[in-house]
């Protein structure tokens, strides 16, 4: 005779799910908005927004997000759908502009270099470390436990913390993160320059520190614009005029030389230093290489089994803005 207990448990589970679904959704929590300038080890201060529940139920963990694209300018009018469930669990949300972006001081390098041997160096890993140190000491009602979460560039600024994590960093989820810009992330596909990506992206991040600048094409058909452009040197000769540092560096280093090897921060990763959930898309047009390299390198030493990856048939970051249950 078959055991009927699994069927009974399944029936009870389905009844429970139906009961929960029938309940009214919980009211969105109200958040206190605070903007601060957090000092780094070299004196530069980074623009940071702290969103704290007005009526917290005890000390809360901090969920930290570092981005080059801008921080919230006002309190949530409604909770963004991508963090709705996290908000219901109870977090202090912290969003920070990277060094040199918007009100953050210093120079934005659009660089992934990390020099673990130079105690005076500043980079995305040290800026995250210094920020977490400040947050756990200065944000009221936090429980000294920090998590980090991000997709794409914010996935990178999350993943790079694996190299030198702050003791208060307890878990991360790096998603669609680049790891090697020459091999097969963002700017190159195994050394072949993605011209139609790098030009626009470098302009967006480095033309004006106070906004995300969109390159103004002269034609609607971007593909045709690049066909008509001619030589790669015409990008600077006709349009950028040497004003975008990252574009200059990219075209000055067409081969996999020391410049790109130093940018490949993942080559310094040899262990899973923080419990981490990596997310990758099989159809990621931007970063098909990074998530797997991060996962592979973190697995070199993972005695506590804290290194995980989830992958699906998604384009770049598709799962973050929706359910991720369909393509297109």
PLM feature spans:
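N-terminal cap/lid segment of alpha/beta-hydrolase-fold proteins
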Residues: 24-58
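Alpha/beta-hydrolase fold nucleophile elbow
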Residues: 140-152
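Short beta-strand/loop motif that positions the catalytic acidic residue
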Residues: 272, 278-280
């Amino acid at each position: 005779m078959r055991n009927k207990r699994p069927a009974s448990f399944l029936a009870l589970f389905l009844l429970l799910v139906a009961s929960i679904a029938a309940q009214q959704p919980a009211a969105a929590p109200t958040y206190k908005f605070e903007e601060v300038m957090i000092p780094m080890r070299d004196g530069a201060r980074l623009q940071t927004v702290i969103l704290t529940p007005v009526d917290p139920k005890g000390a809360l963990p901090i969920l930290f997000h570092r981005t080059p694209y801008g921080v919230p300018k006002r309190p949530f009018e409604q909770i963004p759908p991508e963090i709705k469930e996290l908000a219901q669990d109870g977090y202090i949300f912290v969003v920070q502009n990277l060094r040199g972006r918007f009100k953050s001081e210093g120079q934005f390098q659009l660089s992934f270099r990390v020099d673990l041997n130079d105690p005076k160096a500043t980079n995305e890993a040290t800026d995250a470390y210094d920020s977490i140190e400040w947050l756990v000491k200065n944000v009221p009602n936090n429980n000294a436990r920090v998590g980090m979460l991000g997709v794409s560039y914010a996935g990178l600024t999350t993943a790079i913390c694996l190299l030198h994590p702050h003791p208060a960093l307890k878990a991360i989820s790096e998603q669609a993160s680049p790891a090697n810009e020459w091999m097969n992330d963002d700017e190159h596909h195994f050394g072949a320059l993605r011209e139609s990506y790098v030009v626009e992206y470098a302009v967006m991040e480095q033309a004006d520190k106070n906004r995300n600048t969109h390159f103004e094409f002269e034609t609607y058909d971007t593909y045709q614009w690049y066909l008509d452009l001619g030589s790669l040197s015409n990008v600077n000769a006709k349009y950028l005029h040497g004003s975008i540092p990252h574009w200059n560096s990219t075209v000055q280093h067409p081969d996999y030389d020391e410049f790109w090897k130093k940018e490949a921060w993942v080559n310094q990763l040899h262990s899973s230093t923080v419990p981490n959930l990596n997310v990758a898309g099989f159809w990621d047009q931007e970063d098909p290489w990074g998530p797997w390299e991060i996962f592979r390198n973190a697995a070199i030493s993972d005695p506590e089994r804290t290194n995980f990856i989830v992958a699906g048939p998604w384009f770049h970051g598709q799962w973050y803005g929706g359910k991720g249950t369909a393509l297109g």
